[in-house]
Amino acid sequence: APLFHIGGLNVMTISAFQMGSPLVLLRHLDPRAVLEAIAEHKVTHMFGAPAMFLFMSQHPAFSETDLSSVDILIVGAAPCPASLIALYGERGISFCQGYGLTETSPFASFLGPQKCLEKLGSAGLPPVHTDVRIVDANNQPLGPQERGEICIKGPNIMKGYWNRPDATASAIDELGWFHSGDVGYLDEEGYLYICDR
């Protein structure tokens, strides 16, 4: 993921620096180069959009590349298709799905590998101290399975847009809920599903 995105910077890069882990950065997405880097550097975790992992799987070198070092692929930006989860699963690789924005620093929800197939298409549950709700056009909370705007509240929410008080006021309501503009729903267990971004 690009370093100018919250996922590329906070999810992997800063975390790796904090833990003293090696980090492999490539200038752009070239499926062959990514596969070669995974094999050469024994990559254990990788963050990307489903399309990135799809492009890698479609490359002729995919079937012959040693991916045995990879434990987890962290996916964001869109739901990950079951066929892609199954394809990588055949190689012993699990997926985690997340949802967030720069304004949510970085996660609003996260789905670990143990629930990846059971909650297919879900972006998971909010992290500790973070709440997610779905509202209608009148800012009224909706029930399970009802689609509406995804709103997030917690200490991870930005304080505001730099020198843009009007934009801040339209994004964060008087109760502190950040209005993402994204459409989704919660299931009966509180798992978030993204419908439109």
Question: Model regions: which residues?
Answer:
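Conserved ATP-binding/catalytic segment of the ANL
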Residues: 125, 141-145, 149-197
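Alpha-helix capping/helix-boundary segments
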Residues: 30, 51-53, 80, 157
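Active-site loops of AMP-binding adenylate-forming
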Residues: 60-61, 89, 93, 101-120, ...
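Short gly/Ser/Thr-rich phosphate-binding loop of adenylate-forming enzymes
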Residues: 35, 72-94, 101, 111, ...
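Conserved helix-loop-beta element of the AMP-binding
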Residues: 24, 44-48, 61-83, 89-90
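Residue-level signal for inorganic ion chemistry
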Residues: 20, 38, 46-49, 139, ...
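Conserved AMP-binding/adenylation subdomain of ANL enzymes
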Residues: 4-44, 59
